[in-house]
Amino acid sequence: AQLGLGVKTSSIQKIFIQGDFTQTQNPLDIAIQGKGFFQISQSDGTIGYTRAGAFKLDNTGQLVTADGLVLEPAITIPTDALDISIDSQGSVSVTQPGATAPTIVGTIQLATFQNEAGLQATGFNLFRQTDASGTPTIGNPQSQDRGATQQGFIELSNVSVVEELVNLISAQRAYEVNSRTVQTADE
């Protein structure tokens, strides 16, 4: 008889299919409709990539993640801004007291990769580029194959809990049937 070598997970693959959106009423929340990742300046000086667009302002007025990491390229909102507007092409403008028209303070740029599945998770919804992902192509939203930015929304998980629970129950039933088959064969 030959002894088995057991099983192990060879890899866990991330699936970057877009999730549903939920409206937040927060003008600093930004969802990406289509392909692309926000660029985030990490504390070690490297750039991380994320689709999590729940941003806030730090004490200097810069757009940052919930963990305080700066969005790249950096965008600073003036402290006296009355209104913040982000269009589908990533242009960020503010209305200031006494101004007759909004002022553009920056443009959000998105990164795309030849092979998104090659990105390596680093935690906190951040990923880093690898040889497998290729180098990022950076550009404005709605240019080339990049998605559009949507202000006041965040992207939800792309996993359907109900569907995954059904899959788990099916796997459990298959295991039980196979277990009974082996038990019957042993008797």
Give, region by region, the residue ranges found by the protein language model.
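Amphipathic alpha-helical polymerization modules
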Residues: 1-187
